[in-house]
Amino acid sequence: MGQKVCAHGFRVGPTLIKGWDSVLYAEKHYKTLFIQDLKIRDLINKGFNQAQVSRVLIERPSNKSIIISINAKKPNIIIGRNGSEIDKLKKAIEKMTFLKEVYINIHEVRKFNIDAAIVAQTIALQLEKRVSFRKAMKTAIQASLKQGGQGIRVSCSGRLGGAEIARTEWYIEGRMPLHTLRADIDYSTAEAITTYGVIGVKVWIYKGEYTENKRYN
């Protein structure tokens, strides 16, 4: 079971280690708010892809306000010069949600080598620059283990190296207890758009077992 399902979704819950990326309560308008959340994430991820966004947490404490927390490797790109970019983003979200109280919090990811989303995006960027997929994968694995990761698995699928037949190659180092619910495993995917076609990248990073001090929402 743990080998097949999403490692993040498998651990989402109030008593488990992972928290939801959208926090809201709605009886009748859930569908509308859910679509708004998807559009906001798409706007941030595509508009600031160079910032290497790790996570977008959207909270709606009331019907009149929205709080968006963005974790990124390069937060300065999102903020912009004198806050110009973040002001544009705020106005776009106000127009999209019809809310006047829009709050945006930006956090820098310091240990980016053990953040699955950033590692996957980094590998995808290297593949787009025609770096060897084996070199990109092995470099990511070494950097992750040096920064405190206890295990990492990287998978690349597609026409690797320009081959006519698509295939999947993966490397794993350290431990990867996917069946253990208390294991803190970060998982993410990315896509590399190459001249040969799309190459899919998947990353699993094991950071140790769950404790109360490590839990986040």
From Swiss-Prot:
Keywords: Ribonucleoprotein, Ribosomal protein, RNA-binding, rRNA-binding
Keyword rRNA-binding among UniProt keywords: yes
Superkingdom of the organism of origin: Bacteria
SMART domains: KH
Gene3D superfamilies associated with the record: 3.30.300.20, Ribosomal protein S3, C-terminal domain
PROSITE patterns: KH_TYPE_2, RIBOSOMAL_S3
GO cellular component: cytosolic small ribosomal subunit
A family per Pfam: Ribosomal_S3_C
MF annotations from Gene Ontology: mRNA binding; rRNA binding; structural constituent of ribosome
Domain (KH type-2): residue spans on this chain: 40-110
GO biological process, one term: translation
Keyword Membrane on entry: no
Family named by the database record: Belongs to the universal ribosomal protein uS3 family.
Oligomeric and partner information: Part of the 30S ribosomal subunit. Forms a tight complex with proteins S10 and S14.
Function as written in the Swiss-Prot or TrEMBL entry: Binds the lower part of the 30S subunit head. Binds mRNA in the 70S ribosome, positioning it for translation.
HAMAP family: Ribosomal_uS3_B (MF_01309_B)
Name of the protein: Small ribosomal subunit protein uS3
GN (gene name): rpsC
